[in-house]
Amino acid sequence: MELEPCSSSPERCKVCGDTGNGMHFGAFTCRACAAFFRRAASRKFLRKCENHLIFALKCKNCRLQRCYEAGMSSENFQFCRDLIGAKGAIPKLKVPKSFEQTVGRPYFVLQCDPEVLFLRRNIIDCVPLLEKAEKLIEFGSESPVFSKNRLLKLAQGLQQFQDAKSNQVKFVQKMGQKEIMSFFETDFLCATKWFTYLDEFQFLDKNQQLTLMQGIWHVWSRLHKLAVSAMGRRRGICDKNTVMVSHQNEFAVCDLNEIEVDMSWCTNFSNEQMRYFLDTSHDSYVYQVMDEMLGLKPNDVELSYMMCQLCLQYAGQRFQGEILEFCEKMLGFLADDLHSYYVKQLRMPNYAARLAKLMKINNRIKVDMLKMRQRQEISRVFDIWTIDFSHPEFIQDANAC
């Protein structure tokens, strides 16, 4: 039995005449022509062929023109059918914000009412204090004072601030506005009085003198407080948990970890919330450096040099200009005086090791001042104080308490 050939022949591609595959973009074509049209129809540079009078399959323009004539259209293109490409972008995992980041406030002031931050601020007038300082500068040092050099004269002037005129010792258990402002005034005037023993200080302009003292009084006070506390421990006036200062005509002793500080006059936050900004704990630099101070036992000459080195270097870096020139010049003179004191009076030519230990104490105080500056920046950002000083130079880098 013979098979009869199929009467129906396969349909041809309407573009190239080859065996067709199916409907593609509106016309029955082969897969090759369908792929060609899919690529060529989206290109702008292909246009009607002007080189061939008859159809040429190898000519892209002719082939594209034949596709259009066969009924193929780019409107039949389908997009975004790729399952991989059609997937949406995977969202990035984000760490959830903390409550502090959400409200924009640090954890230690979260429980405070934000409205209290916008109350009227009180101004502390420093003009009367500056007037007192002007009188001290005009009066000058106690006379007559005869010394071989500047450093020895400063050491003589320091003695009047080391001892209190009265033998009474006052134990301070609470500090409020009255006590804090009293200590502030005493420290500033004592530092001003002491610098009048430096003859070159009198050569500065009056404004420069006051500017210098506004910047360095708290630096002088830090080292002076440390020296008086060390003296108190050696004499048995205070123990290892207390700090002693020479205040007016008497000694004042307090335990920084136990003292009660009333800050309601300068802030609306509680003492617990303000603890970070106050130097009232056993973490204070006084406790950290006290052992080194007791071990070295610097005399008045060495202590005077430490104060000048600490204060003048700080002032030069802060104010620049003529004050910087003055500070560098004085530091050079005082270094020569200290060398002469060690070599000629103490007969100690190899004093480098001892001087390095003294400067180590100064460096520890500088580190503490840097920490205080960072705390002040934080307090300024969050506007925690309700007071302002008429002369802000007084409190830059100074202890809050």
Curated annotation (Swiss-Prot):
Coiled coil: none annotated. It is found in: Nucleus. PROSITE patterns: NR_LBD, NUCLEAR_REC_DBD_1, NUCLEAR_REC_DBD_2. Gene3D superfamilies: Erythroid Transcription Factor GATA-1, subunit A (3.30.50.10), Retinoid X Receptor (1.10.565.10). It comes from the Eukaryota. Its main location: nucleus. GO terms for molecular function: DNA-binding transcription factor activity; sequence-specific DNA binding; zinc ion binding. Keywords: DNA-binding, Metal-binding, Nucleus, Receptor, Transcription, Transcription regulation, Zinc, Zinc-finger. Residues 10-79 bind DNA. Residues 132-398 form the NR LBD domain. A zinc finger (NR C4-type) spans 13-33, 49-67. GO terms for cellular component: nucleus. Orphan nuclear receptor. Belongs to the nuclear hormone receptor family. This is Nuclear hormone receptor family member nhr-65.
